[in-house]
Amino acid sequence: LMVLALTMSSPTLLAGVVENYDFKENHTGYTLYFKQINDNEARLMQLNIDNYDTEIVIPSVVKDTYGYEFKVTAIGQLYNEKYNDKGIDFSYMGQCTSIFGNVSNCPNYIKSVAIPESVKTIWPLAFSGSLKDGYGLGCKSLTIPGNVTEIGAGAFKYAKFEQVAIP
């Protein structure tokens, strides 16, 4: 296990509205929105946080409203609908945007984000914030599993972590 200690500036976060999702999971303090990739896979496309003092666990498997299971293999949000899951250029940030909804300043930050072993790709700008607006994911710790084989450009741009663990 490799652990990186990062400097954290003033933490901030989000809460927002998402459209075009296929299914969602409500948890105490946060809601996860998913988009179906194919018959067996889904990606986390948005994370809305209601309680900033929480531990966010992204599941390895999600169910749709009919009970069908989908393995969560990606984290990311398309910039607009003209792009699709299969055509993502991981070196280019123009196709994607952050998984966070509307962002606002918050005096606290979330405890942790745990990404499951099922995730293989983290899209460009997935956990990014904005230097111009001064926001980014404020998080005490993030765990990135060893199964992640691709991390897109700017995936953690302007994010604020105290600790990142990469097994």
Question: What kind of region is each of these model predictions?
Answer:
Residues 13-17:
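Boundary at the C-terminal end of the N-terminal hydrophobic targeting segment
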Residues 1-9:
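Bacterial N-terminal signal peptides
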Residues 21-22, 154-156:
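A generic structural signal for ordered secondary structure
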Residues 22-50:
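GGW-centered surface loops in extracellular recognition modules
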Residues 76-79:
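Signature of short aromatic-glycine-proline-rich micro-motifs recurring in repeat-based ectodomains
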Residues 37-40, 51-73, 83-121, 132-150, ...:
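Structural signature of tandem-repeat unit edges
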Residues 8-12, 129, 158:
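Compositionally biased non-globular segments, especially hydrophobic aliphatic-rich helices
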Residues 123-126, 152-155:
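Consensus positions within tandem repeat domains that build extended binding/scaffold surfaces
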